[in-house]
Amino acid sequence: MNPFFKLLRVSLGHKVSFKNQISPDEWKRIYDTAKLHAVAGLLYVGIQRLPKELQPPTELMMEWFVLAKKIEQKNKFLNLRAVELTEKFRQDGFRSCILKGQGVARLYPNPYCRQSGDIDIWVEGGRKKVYRYLKGQIGQPLEMEFHHAQYPIFEDAEVEVHFIPANPQWPYSFWQVNRFTKSLEEEQFSHRVELPEGVGEIGVPTAAFDRIYSLAHIYKHFFSEGIGLRQIVDYYYILRQGFTEEERQETVKWLKRIRMYKFARAMMFVQHCVLGLEEQYLLCEPDTKEGNFLMKTIMQGGN
């Protein structure tokens, strides 16, 4: 296993031995790869667990520290914005659910090490009603696609308001995924959690929902923008929430129905053999051939 993936495993809490010191050039490659895949904050957690003699050169260590602090500060800021946005919709009569982003970051042992982007929020009410509300709030037409609209409510944080969580660009499976999300819709808008440091509550998906939704989102990236390791690590922590055998079978049933079971088996290989996810958290039997192909595709992509 190369040093990058060893460090990734250490960052995820696994015990890994480094037999040889890592050269300064190799550390630079690790840092660049971490930035490309938006996992630099997570890998900094791993670096802090290494003996001092195995850590990066001082100059790179300081650069990494500064980046990790910026990631931490942005997470804290977006947590506040997510709570503010959730409360704004609630006061105006709309229930909501934060997709990905800050909702997933809370699953990390260090919720501030995940590199965040914009705020994706699913708002109850349907496309016409929600768009009418958003347009009324801004006072002008919004940039909109079938399933979401850009909502420039903040100058310092991008917000996408989703009318439905399913993306019509998802290959093969849009209507089936939409059917799945519809079947669990009430639970998602009722599932609220407290964010770190008592900043407030947001709605987030249930584990049962996220096991399908997040994998479908990754699947869409597989055919379009490319997959980054941040998405793979997100799914690692989603799976580590655990499930009963009955819940696993229900998830597998839906994966087969929406024609993502083959992709799920490839993902289980990556989760188990690359990230070190324990067998008890795997949804199905890993597929080595498809998993190696998926891993190659991931490393050619990036966030």
Describe the predicted segments one by one.
Residues 1-117, 122-303:
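Conserved NTP-donor binding/palm subdomain of two-metal-ion nucleotidyltransferases/polymerases, i.e.
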